[in-house]
Amino acid sequence: MKPEIEQELSHTLLTELLAYQFASPVRWIETQDVFLKQHNTERIIEIGPSPTLAGMANRTIKAKYESYDAALSLQRQVLCYSKDAKEIYYKPDPADLAPKETPKQEESTPSAPAAATPTPAAAAAPTPAPAPASAGPVESIPDEPVKANLLIHVLVAQKLKKPLDAVPMTKAIKDLVNGKSTVQNEILGDLGKEFGSTPEKPEDTPLEELAEQFQDSFSGQLGKTSTSLIGRLMSSKMPGGFSITTARKYLESRFGLGAGRQDSVLLMALTNEPANRLGSEADAKTFFDGIAQKYASSAGISLSSGAGSGAGAANSGGAVVDSAALDALTAENKKLAKQQLEVLARYLQSRLKQGSLKSFIKEKEASAVLQKELDLWEAEHGEFYAKGIQPTFSALKSRTYDSYWNWARQDVLSMYFDIIFGKLTSVDRETINQCIQIMNRANPTLIKFMQYHIDHCPEYKGETYKLAKRLGQQLIDNCKQVLTEDPVYKDVSRITGPKTKVSAKGNIEYEETQKDSVRKFEQYVYEMAQGGAMTKVSQPTIQEDLARVYKAISKQASKDSKLELQRVYEDLLKVVESSKEIETEQLTKDILQAATVPTTPTEEVDDPCTPSSDDEIASLPDKTSIIQPVSSTIPSQTIPFLHIQKKTKDGWEYNKKLSSLYLDGLESAAINGLTFKDKYVLVTGAGAGSIGAEILQGLISGGAKVIVTTSRFSKKVTEYYQNMYARYGAAGSTLIVVPFNQGSKQDVDALVQYIYDEPKKGGLGWDLDAIIPFAAIPENGNGLDNIDSKSEFAHRIMLTNLLRLLGAVKSKKPTDTRPAQCILPLSPNHGTFGFDGLYSESKISLETLFNRWYSEDWGSKLTVCGAVIGWTRGTGLMSANNIIAEGIEKLGVRTFSQKEMAFNILGLLTPEIVQLCQEEPVMADLNGGLQFIDNLKDFTSKLRTDLLETADIRRAVSIESAIEQKVVNGDNVDANYSKVMVEPRANMKFDFPTLKSYDEIKQIAPELEGMLDLENVVVVTGFAEVGPWGNSRTRWEMEAYGEFSLEGAIEMAWIMGFIKYHNGNLQGKPYSGWVDAKTQTPIDEKDIKSKYEEEILEHSGIRLIEPELFNGYDPKKKQMIQEIVVQHDLEPFECSKETAEQYKHEHGEKCEIFEIEESGEYTVRILKGATLYVPKALRFDRLVAGQIPTGWDARTYGIPEDTISQVDPITLYVLVATVEALLSAGITDPYEFYKYVHVSEVGNCSGSGMGGVSALRGMFKDRYADKPVQNDILQESFINTMSAWVNMLLLSSSGPIKTPVGACATAVESVDIGIETILSGKAKVVLVGGYDDFQEEGSYEFANMNATSNSIEEFKHGRTPKEMSRPTTTTRNGFMEAQGSGIQVIMTADLALKMGVPIHAVLAMTATATDKIGRSVPAPGKGILTTAREHHGNLKYPSPLLNIKYRKRQLNKRLEQIKSWEETELSYLQEEAELAKEEFGDEFSMHEFLKERTEEVYRESKRQVSDAKKQWGNSFYKSDPRIAPLRGALAAFNLTIDDIGVASFHGTSTVANDKNESATINNMMKHLGRSEGNPVFGVFQKYLTGHPKGAAGAWMLNGAIQILESGLVPGNRNADNVDKLLEQYEYVLYPSRSIQTDGIKAVSVTSFGFGQKGAQAVVVHPDYLFAVLDRSTYEEYATKVSARNKKTYRYMHNAITRNTMFVAKDKAPYSDELEQPVYLDPLARVEENKKKLVFSDKTIQSNQSYVGEVAQKTAKALSTLNKSSKGVGVDVELLSAINIDNETFIERNFTGNEVEYCLNTAHPQASFTGTWSAKEAVFKALGVESKGAGASLIDIEITRDVNGAPKVILHGEAKKAAAKAGVKNVNISISHDDFQATAVALSEF
């Protein structure tokens, strides 16, 4: 056959085949069955560009033939030509053919260490191992120029940022870009530059065909685009020196590739670009090895890296070089180089090595000396000592706490709500203690605060409110009494004792139990005075002494004198027995009996723990006169447990007089309290659980100013002291906490200097009154033979440096008239216990100070009071002995709790003891009689041994019994008695707001019903955010509770990518649940919190900047560039011709370029004098920011990859926040909006301060650096682009789009614009909110303005990242930047009710304001005060418009007028119809005319009602100078300025803002007459989140909504000490902890932005909106919301488990043909079609869309009535006009049948209203005389026939009147909608 005939036949065959293909159905399934089943084909090959049919064949085999093939032992192979060429042609991999070395060769070859191959940055696919190198020349491969196919494929894939195999050549560019026109334009532009010209419509042509079209004219050379991209790849990702020429030479020498194939390899490298610059040339070669292998695979060639021929090639594993020969070869070169170096040195007159050698020797000698000294020091002092003495003191880290005035109000409020919520039901000791602390902080502001809350306590709500009112009033009265008194330390705690038990299972259990015999400290003092059996001493009586004297004298006396002596002796005895002044044992007993009668503990009846004794609070301020002091009850010959000793020649001995002084002081302190006002005290050793901590509590509760030291300075420690001060700090008290190591001499000196230095020098300027140095460390286990480094260090702390401390204070004391009292911590342990190192020696040595006080010169500046501290349970030193304390007390001595010992020591600070200390040193024995126990060590050892022995026996018996029971009764015998822990399961609810019952709603605001126009009320129906704490739910958990719940932890773990949901086979078994994202191992949901919480907290919130989140930005190495001038010619480098010419263009004569002939590349040499920009790095001091949680990924939510790669990161935050906000509104499909509103009525008013900063960075910085940047980067930088993406991917609306830019106030400004957009009628649904990102550029510029927190300084001050944002505190120092987005869905209340979406809050008011003239853009201003603008003048009475009853009366009058107008208009329609008939002639349709006109009348009536409600409800206050916008907005909901419960502050933590904002809110409240004593809660969210700029107001608004929903007010947990300057703002409370209230009615949100932007929004609880509704409307709404909640709940769970929360729309809800018709019909609505909401032809310009059902029914009735001219009645009633809850009204006007019918309808309110309207219409149709407006209409009954049609039945008077008027029958028509009911009646005569 001739070729031309063959070609013609082939053409015909192809045409026919194609025709058949297009015209016939595809029967591929049948075809597969033929070759798979009939022919049992085992090898199937697809010839085509991609494995399309092969994939289908694989699926078919798996689904249908798997078992079939197994039965027949068929092993099928499905291949595709495009990817399986080697398998098809049976070509082995070249690597498999590489020669393998034999073991013998390996042994004979000298082994060398294997060099670790550096791994290059990850490319798109795994890099295959290169073929082993060969010594011979590589076999060259026939060259082939680049094909257009590959070039186009690479250029498109590179632009799409996808690997080649992800870009099918069968698709057109238009399909590949997925609708992104800018990317499409970029690709076409690149192709144009590459090929010179493009065919027509290349975007619609598949890449295969496009390549064929280009191939005809393609030269095979790389063009401009590809050359530029390759050049950029080499310069940005290859190591220095590895140029294009190097790469080409390597490819040629390594694989024998020619220039064309080299081009192809370089092209393929573009789609496998490394993530980072490769580190070395070896890495680069490895990279190109992999690319070359890929190219070879795609090109169908084999690569070999060794010689293709030659006998030696196969066996050559690499040449072996003789090392000796190599050394000889290089020796001469090294020698020459050395000689040259020496010549140069001589020329420079510099001797090599001499200087460095001398210095080296000196350094070595010095180093040896130093090392010797260090070794000696280490050997002598030990490692522990060396580390222990390191100084830690820093004045910068000091914490000052003095804001008692704020904590007092916080505590009062907490107590108030504790009573209300039943947490506090009786007055116990703790409550009394709280009351004392509150009284200690009483001031006029606090009293007003308490009085307001007690006066407004709603007792009708229950018993707890009554209790709160009663107790609260008592506390107020107490506070008034002590207002002028000094604060006192008064401990009312229960006295406890030790109790040790051994359980049946052998467990030793210790607890502190209340003592029944001693209930309060007054009785405790009495007990201490009595002493015990062990403290009794046998002392001779006076009589016995006289007898001994008499006997001694009488022996030496004469008989006469003996008689005289006997008479004198007898007289003396009589005097002793009769004298009341001489103490005897009997007299002591008598006194004791008298004293114990009224105070016997068993007879005490006024124990404040009893519930009935709440009057204990009332008696707290009373001062008790002590008639009989406790000292008078000290028994004879008994030493009290607590006593004072006096120094005698025999040592220290008990002194009764001094002890009485001390005990009486203790008694007074217990009964009346002890004040420390104006006392300055230093306390060391006051850690948690120590005696010092209890002493510290007492000092600050008594009003002292205390500086306390801590050796373990941390956030946890400072929080401990802050909490202590917040609870116990009294008026005038101050607590200062500093880090301090008492083992460091430097710290001792620095501490004292800090205390005494003047404030201007950075000190306190104090003069100490007392020093309580209790610092110590335990030395347990150190005996005489083990006095180690720790013992020596402990000795230094407890003795050496304690003395230094006293000495330093002495040297700083300014005068001799104010000595500081030092309470020395002595111990009875003088080696008694043993094995405690140098503890005893340290304590004994302190006693030398009693003598030195006399012998040295510091007695006038320091006084000494030794306190021998007894056995104190629970301290760090003694806690191990707790279990034997009970046994010790049974010996007749006393052990003490920490509170008791602190009380004892504080008793040494009474004025009497202080005075005594100034006269002489005082020794206070607080040992509890322990010193009277001989062999204490033996007793303690025996007690411990007995306990352990008992425990062992019981344990053994328990185990034996258990074994016996199991043998007898089986292993499960204990099952019923075993303790089972019920572990909680996660329950992720995604709840909507809880709806109250209608009756509860009506109680809130009964007058509100029907008062507001709901189309002019804007509500928040959805809200969400993306921020440092995840989303709004997880942020609220952290803000409100300070920790994540189990559900919150799961959600955060999911957000951060720690876990994912798995549903399918796992490890060979079906599994449905959470798995660890890294290991793919299952994890139980209850374990998620414990496993991931630490990591979650570490990588969320405010934290150190994580470079991986910000493209590698590390503030510690912030990169900048600096211009330098080149001082000498630089080394040449290689680049492309285009780049070389650009260098030449820039540098001119200072740049040389030359072409490299081999490669066509150019070398460039920068010459002297050229200017270059050289990067440098500085240490930036803003290291901390609020960052999105690490691991946050838009893919987790379902956002497509192409969108992620296209948009700015902030757009992703906005998309996620938007979809979550919609879900929060119950909207699972945004197109649902269009069922209720037109596409033009959904708008977007969200905005940003900066917009896409990542895009801006790319546009300016990266583009300037010539880094790869997408060509459409500009569009992503626009602030409105984020809103555009929301519309393009989710909404497809055509409504208003407004983009506010208000810096930090953007979000609230957005809400303001959104509300205006809705109220102006331009939209009914609007997305509002704000968003901003964090980037280094903004961070740097904020720092330049000194606006942000300096992290370096904060670290110096001991702050952790999470506490660096501290609004309102004394130490606040700049805001903390953050990033994220916040979105709210707002709409009209009317629409929200119709849709049944949740209403989270009502937006009662928004406003923005500028400030005054100035020159500072960021300066804070008070312009927003204008929301409280209101003229007062000398006006005395409020405007009546503020009275809702007045407004309601006016509204009702107006509604009556509208009703009358509507009825009149409807009755005139007949006349209008007659006139219209004449006008339109034959074309006139009576029915159509009446229908349209009726609808117009209805719409006009509705508009008038709306205007009336706006006038008297929504907008009555506007433009009224007497009513402030803020007051008016609240009054619209029947609220007052007192009802704003919370003010959410902008609170940036800057010095200026927090003061300015507090002043603004305070003045706002004051001007509007807020009640005194009623401050708003101040919420300062930014302590937790940082400041996200544009998103700030959105997050605050979300928090405000959550406050309304929960009633919980979150505290500012970083408010460790509120600034004293803020105390003046009495209308603001600054809580530091969350407070659960009984409900918040309204919340104010204020926001301030740079550029004179002030903004405020007020949200009101939705209950006040629901109060506007009637019962049926509310209950119908509740039903809708419940159904929507269930649907959303299901959707959210599916979204999280399937990662499908975000589902991008791919089509608008209308076809292209319907786009414009939809825009042009405002009544067009979507319908559900195949489970999708879409517009259709029938919904556009529909005849049914304008005229409503009511109008049609009414028109029909009117057209019927047109035949008669009399007996017509028309009545119109608003649904809200009929009160169906009024039983009297129903009984008087409706029959039983009517009531039953109406109540059983779907809408009872409408049914009753329609029936009433029908009665009125019938009455009018009868034409009889009215009996007045109040006449009953029960005689007119409206019934329904079998078809439901209304019928009229007349009874009684109505029937008589009808008969009299000649009416035979009355026809009635009723219709209603959700607004009104209309009835038309016609009488038949």
UniProtKB/Swiss-Prot annotation:
Residues 92-140 are annotated as: Disordered. Acetyl-CoA binds at residues 1771-1773, 1797, 1807, 1816-1826, 1840-1843, 1870-1872. Residues 108-126 have a biased composition (Low complexity). The modification O-(pantetheine 4'-phosphoryl)serine is found at residue 181. InterPro entries: 4-PPantetheinyl_Trfase_dom (IPR008278), 4-PPantetheinyl_Trfase_dom_sf (IPR037143), ACPS (IPR002582), Acyl_Trfase/lysoPLipase (IPR016035), Fas_alpha_ACP (IPR040899), FAS_alpha_su_C (IPR047224), FAS_alpha_yeast (IPR026025), FASI_helical (IPR041550). Residues 1121-1661 form the Ketosynthase family 3 (KS3) domain. Residues 146-221 form the Carrier domain. [Alpha(6)beta(6)] hexamers of two multifunctional subunits (alpha and beta). This is Fatty acid synthase subunit alpha.
